[in-house]
UniProtKB/Swiss-Prot annotation:
Chain ranges passing through the membrane: none
Name the UniProt record assigns to this protein: Ig kappa chain V-V region T1
Matches recorded under CDD domains: IgV_L_kappa
Residues covered by region (Framework-3): 77-108
Organism, scientific name: Mus musculus
Region (Framework-4): 118-127
One GO CC term on file: immunoglobulin complex
C-alpha cells in the first residue's frame, strides 16, 4: 500500500505543469509622506506575470478604485501624478507629487493566472 506522500510524489510527476498560487509581495507595508513629496510603492511577484498587474487605491468605507492596469496604463479620470512601471516580476507605483486625497491603502493585483492574487497592501499616511 502506498503512503499519502508517495501518492503526492506521483501526482507531481504526473502533472509537471502544476503551479502554486502567485505570491505578491508589497513594500513598504506602511509609509508616511509629506504633501508634494514623490512616493513609490513596490510590488514583486513570485514568478513572471508579464505586465498583468493592476494597482488599486482603497479608502475607508469606500469601494476600491482602480488606478492603473497592464502595469502602466492609467485608468480614465485618474490624475497624471500616478504612474506605474515594471514587467516580469518587479513593479512599482509612483505618485509624483502627493496630495491629501491620495491617503489610503494601495494594493497590487496580478491577473496573469488564476487564482488572482493581491499584495498585502501599503498604507499611505500624511507625515505630520
Amino acid at each position: 500500500m502506498r503512503t499519502p506522500a508517495q501518492f503526492l510524489g506521483i501526482l507531481l510527476l504526473w502533472f509537471p505543469g502544476i503551479k502554486c498560487d502567485i505570491k505578491m509581495t508589497q513594500s513598504p507595508s506602511s509609509m508616511y509622506a509629506s504633501l508634494g513629496e514623490r512616493v513609490t510603492i513596490s510590488c514583486k511577484a513570485s514568478q513572471d506575470i508579464n505586465s498583468y498587474l493592476t494597482w488599486f487605491q482603497q479608502k475607508p468605507g469606500k469601494s476600491p478604485k482602480t488606478l492603473l492596469y497592464r502595469a502602466n496604463r492609467l485608468v480614465d479620470g485618474v490624475p497624471s501624478r500616478f504612474s506605474g512601471s515594471g514587467s516580469g516580476q518587479d513593479f512599482s507605483l509612483t505618485i509624483s507629487s502627493l496630495e491629501y486625497e491620495d491617503m489610503g491603502i494601495y494594493y497590487c493585483l496580478q491577473y496573469d493566472e488564476f487564482p488572482l492574487t493581491f499584495g498585502a497592501g501599503t498604507k499611505l499616511e500624511l507625515k505630520r
